[in-house]
Amino acid sequence: MLSDIEIARSAKLKKIDLIANELDIPEEYYNLYGKNIAKVSHKYLNELNFKNDGNLVMVTAITPTPAGEGKTTTSISLSMALNKIHKRSIVTLREPSLGPVMGIKGGAAGGGYSQVLPMEDINLHFTGDIHAVTSAHNLISAILDDYIKYNKYDIDSTQVSWPRTMDMNDRALREIIVALGGKKNGYPRQDGFIITAASEIMAILCLIENLEDLKKKLSNIVVAKNKKGEPVTVKDLEITGALSVLLKDAINPNLVQTIENTPAFVHGGPFANIAHGTNSILATKLALKLSDYVVTETGFGSDLGGEKFYDFVSPTFGLKPSATVLVATIRALKYHGGQNLKDLNTPNLESLEKGLPNLQVHVENLKKYNIPVVVSLNKFYSDTDEEINMVKDYCDKLGVEVSVNEGFEKGSEGAIDLAEKVVKVSEQQSELKSIYDFKDPLEVKIEKLAKNIYRASKVEYSSEALSTIKFLKKYGYENLPVIVAKTQYSISDDPKKLGFPKDYTFTIRDFELSAGAGFIVALAGDILRMPGLSKVPNAVNMDIDNEGNISGLS
């Protein structure tokens, strides 16, 4: 089979203005970035209020292996298949972060015959959205150190909670000292870098509906404490306007297309293990007005991106999901059954059977939201008929629809059965039921998530967490929704607890306030916001020839 980049180059793309015209987007509401990319103005959403929303399909996954299980590929193939069965469909995805592209993951625009294109541009600099977020984020950092030097706002230099950022994996920058070299360089203090996808500004970009909303959320960001222990906000720094200027174009969704010319919005990129893990709400809302079905991907497993989509994003913006697609793979289930990571392509019914409870816990958890679930078994070349039949039989016992997806090798043709089943269950018109209410006390929200989703028997808080709770309550933040930051490799807070762990203690070690984005981050376990490169990073495989053809980006 051809490589992803070879398949992408062989695709016959339509000019993006033709895709926009097919969606009935007037020319004055989009700007072209070359022949194959356009930015659609957020203002166009105001012109669509008279239209009903289409069906919203959320794609999530079981607990993944380190390599991922193909949610993006599944989302793209499903959207293309819906179009093939004459349902107008748009897929909405997050933008790839450059760090993981150069690191262990490689490209993140789908794979095989289910890709969004132009994949080289999407995986690299794209339309500059991530650069804009990086610039805005670092402006805050620069202003903070400037104000500390000149003693404005009485900022406590030991209580600065706003790190610097860059869109690259670089572990050496996790903990640094800034302002060395004498008085002229400022006041020395401990600092660090996070990857841009982990920035609160990235989360805000994906949670705003217009410029007014952007300015309000930016103003509310808490960046430090003063020497009285009071929060210092961006509004206090008087740079809301400057930040908004830097982000004015980045807030507009990016329109591209799939390998089969299905429209795709690729916009924003917050991680799901430390933020809400979904593409921009502007992209989703635009897509809902322009199509019969919107397929949206959420990050990592259903205990992370899926949970946050149903407990935070959907209630906040009044979204009404019609179906859930749960991506599973035989190799991931064998991994949860104890099979070694390097042997996952070796058939093993015993390991598969032992790993099936991981599928069970995700199905059970998703059913609690009252949205119908379809399991999409993402087929790999190494899967045997016996293994596939074992998963099908198990899904029957769980009372859930299952479809074998071959979108990677066959494009839309490999996902027709999945599309038909999604349409069928969407007709049920179910109403979302979230796990917690926004009005619940912070500790109650966390307990409901821990027991219903993470399957813990109790929750414990460190002394640091208890101290932060007092701060949150004192300054009126306790009623914000909660985003649990935890490992993606287990439904628990311990990456070593594979399968279906239960009856354990879920530990919250501290909280971080994302007042601008509108949520509290509960930290469970050790979560790195600045990844490191792997021993052999994907960057060493990349090259470009004298004709400008890129290799190794897949």
Curated annotation (Swiss-Prot):
InterPro entries: Formate_THF_ligase (IPR000559), Formate_THF_ligase_CS (IPR020628), P-loop_NTPase (IPR027417). One of its GO terms (molecular function) is formate-tetrahydrofolate ligase activity. Pathway: One-carbon metabolism; tetrahydrofolate interconversion. ATP binds at residues 65-72. It catalyses: (6S)-5,6,7,8-tetrahydrofolate + formate + ATP = (6R)-10-formyltetrahydrofolate + ADP + phosphate. GO terms for biological process: tetrahydrofolate interconversion. It comes from the Bacteria. Pfam families: FTHFS (PF01268). Its EC number is 6.3.4.3. Belongs to the formate--tetrahydrofolate ligase family. This is Formate--tetrahydrofolate ligase. It comes from Petrotoga mobilis (strain DSM 10674 / SJ95). The gene is fhs.
